[in-house]
Regions:
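Extended, well-folded catalytic/binding cores that form a central cleft or groove in large enzyme
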Residues: 1-8, 18-148
Length: 148
């Protein structure tokens, strides 16, 4: 399936496709488009939309798109590590809640800095996937250590 969002991804627009490929649609084709073209182009291409104005999955009720996807696809069940990651992504993406998680500033810095390092959005996403894989692994360790 095709999934489309706004170009020049950082934080939420990197976290969401990581979540989509890892937990929702492993074969997802992630497409980055100009913000004013996302909805119309997605309709024409039969793509699902996220983290864009008017998108199917976007910020709502003080939740970032990553959290909305987790809720919509019922991914929180039995996955405390994913919920820990969601708190970090939320704190890095939602301006009113910045600073609510100690790891958020680092994730936000990586997201913003990534835009300066890589001009190609697809390559930026592919390169940033490692960061989310590593952070999710840390979250698994973190929640696992609290459970024992």
């Amino acid at each position: 399936m095709k999934w489309m969002t706004r170009a020049r991804p950082k934080t939420d627009r990197i976290a969401c496709p990581w979540l989509i490929r890892g937990f929702i649609d492993p074969d997802a084709a992630i497409i980055y488009a100009h913000a004013d073209e996302v909805i119309e182009r997605a309709r024409a291409e039969g793509a699902r939309t996220f983290d864009a104005p008017g998108a199917e999955f976007t910020h709502r009720d003080n939740k970032c798109s990553f959290e909305v996807l987790i809720d919509e696809f019922d991914l929180a069940k039995d996955n405390p590590a994913l919920m820990r990651l969601a708190k970090i992504v939320h704190a890095a993406d939602i301006a009113a809640d910045r600073g609510s998680d100690p790891l958020a500033a680092g994730l936000e810095a990586i997201g913003v800095g990534g835009l300066d390092v890589e001009a190609d959005d697809q390559l930026l996403f592919e390169r940033a996937t490692f960061v989310y894989d590593a952070l999710y692994a840390w979250c698994q360790r973190e929640v696992g250590s609290r459970a024992t």
